[in-house]
């Protein structure tokens, strides 16, 4: 897919260039799910994380095969590595529920908190897509069509394809997906 403002890496670059507050006090770029989990576990800014599936959703700035940030791509994007959270496996335990969070949630303090994975990655597993060569149509808030592969497929990665390449939740799983932003949500309007 072509780089556009939808990719978190592009937003991060814009934000870093245009937010005086982040320039002065910002520590890491993270998604909402790791932010919430980190607060439940009482993690510091330096302990922030992102799972490899959500990380691959950045679209730019990472190496999908090594599951590491790509210094070369981040340099091209003018994003300093210091702003990138550590990359973890979706099943890694990132901490334990704090006493304060236990009081607020009603859950027992000290229970382990797992990093988790993105909704699209998990929907692939939930649909039974565990190996290459399968597809699923998802009618969630967005309407998506996902196809599992063994890795990057040049024909699907060409400019203008409208497809995004991602790591799956499980090791060695990959998929392409395209979406329409109002797909499934439009069913509410139709009703």
Regions found by a protein language model. Name each.
Residues 2-118:
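Gly/Ser/Thr-rich active-site cleft segment
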Residues 103, 107, 111-191:
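Catalytic phosphate/nucleotide-handling subdomain of diverse soluble enzymes
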